[in-house]
Amino acid sequence: MGRPSLAEQRRVEICRALQSCLIRNGSYEMTSVKDIAQEAGMAAGMLHHYFESKDDILLVTAEMVLLELQNRLDDLLHTRDAEERRAQLEALLEDNDQNRFFIMLQALGLAMPAVNEMLTAKHDELQEALAERLERRGMAPQQAVAEAGKLAYILWSAVTAPKGVQSDIARQMTADSLDELFPPQ
């Protein structure tokens, strides 16, 4: 796999800048294209060479962040060592910036159909992937779908609770649900 092009690198930098601005400003509406450009270290007019609009930046950023979340969840499910898995889960739940951004995405999804569709699709993909894994482990298809739905909901909910809001009981429930369906070694 080759190095990403300069244009791809700049698009990622702009997406990271949007993410930082949203977290700092606490709102998509309070974040301007000028804020994003300044955070990315470029002139506001340059953003239009990489994205058509602020909404376009948001959608690409959302896709990028949701892919990162999906990869972290995949890593978590593939980890068989109980201590390592618990550490990965804690790191995921402690990633306050990512979790705050994820919460903002869900709020934006209420007003922006494209964001809502993306979130729904990613949640469905997670649930389907979990169901497939459970079926490969010998669980009946209907039960696998039901259990995958529960675990997807628990995992999705866990990453939408900002630091300080997550209770120890909720964290333990998340870990227990994961271990029950995908036992560590």
Task: List each language-model region with its residue ranges.
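Hydrophobic/aromatic-rich alpha-helical bundle segments in the mid-to-C-terminal region
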Residues: 116-120, 124, 135-185
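Solvent-exposed, amphipathic alpha-helical segments
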Residues: 17-25, 71-76, 105, 154-162
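Short, basic, alpha-helical segments at the C-terminal edge of helix-turn-helix-like DNA-binding modules
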Residues: 33, 63-70
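Helix-turn-helix
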Residues: 13, 17, 21-56, 60
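Hydrophobic alpha-helical connector segments
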Residues: 60, 71-100, 136, 141, ...
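Amphipathic alpha-helical segments used for helix-helix packing
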Residues: 94-120
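N-terminal intrinsically disordered/low-complexity leader segments
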Residues: 1-9, 139
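Amphipathic, non-transmembrane alpha-helical scaffold segments
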Residues: 7, 11, 62, 66, ...
